[in-house]
């Protein structure tokens, strides 16, 4: 009851002052805060993802906060939109929380603060099922960031192939061609590029055959690592 009174009183003050800030906060107790997020009526693409990222940055400023409960039902929208927009919000929140702290030693806790979030909603199961799609993207983004952040003397071609092999558990078909196989295929131009390195040259193909029949023509990406 006291908490509701505090929040309602705070909301009235915000309305009276015509505050335009996206995020505001109020102290509930010595260890708890209530964050109020203002949702715009006019929204551009990726609005909720960006808002989630902004919210993470806002919350991270408070040293004593390591976890938060996020109430989705306060978003005044129909069920389908609420599920979609809240999933996007959590996606942005989690993406913003990424840090590559493997080699950090000084102020590591301060620089790599993690904040757990718990969804509080009557549509929890729907949101969790919908978020699986976003979580797969998030995991891919984090893996990519981890790999590109590694120094080249650590993530050499051999080590890189070992990391790629791990993706086979997701259903990807992975083939790794070493120098012997590349020579046999006559791929001498590729081998020539690697002659200046002490590390062995590899070529990796990754295939995903999970598309539906009506997807259209196959897609192929070619890149040099």
Residue ranges and their predicted role:
Residues 1-219, 224-225:
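Short amphipathic alpha-helical segment within the helicase RecA-like ATPase core
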């Amino acid at each position: 009851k006291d908490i509701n009174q505090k929040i309602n009183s705070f909301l009235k003050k915000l309305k009276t002052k015509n505050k335009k800030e996206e995020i505001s906060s109020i102290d509930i107790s010595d260890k708890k805060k209530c964050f109020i997020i203002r949702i715009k009526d006019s929204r551009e693409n990726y609005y909720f993802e960006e808002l989630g990222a902004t919210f993470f940055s806002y919350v991270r400023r408070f040293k004593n906060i390591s976890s938060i409960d996020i109430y989705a039902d306060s978003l005044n929208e129909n069920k389908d939109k609420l599920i979609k927009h809240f999933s996007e919000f959590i996606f942005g929140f989690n993406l913003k929380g990424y840090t590559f702290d493997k080699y950090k030693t000084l102020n590591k806790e301060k620089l790599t603060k993690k904040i757990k979030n718990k969804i509080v909603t009557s549509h929890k199961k729907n949101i969790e099922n919908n978020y699986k799609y976003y979580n797969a993207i998030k995991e891919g983004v984090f893996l990519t960031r981890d790999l590109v952040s590694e120094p080249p003397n650590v993530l050499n071609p051999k080590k890189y192939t070992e990391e790629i092999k791990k993706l086979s558990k997701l259903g990807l078909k992975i083939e790794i061609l070493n120098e012997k196989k590349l020579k046999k295929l006559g791929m001498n131009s590729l081998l020539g590029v690697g002659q200046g390195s002490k590390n062995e040259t590899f070529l990796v193909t990754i295939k995903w055959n999970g598309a539906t029949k009506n997807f259209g023509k196959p897609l192929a990406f070619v890149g040099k690592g």
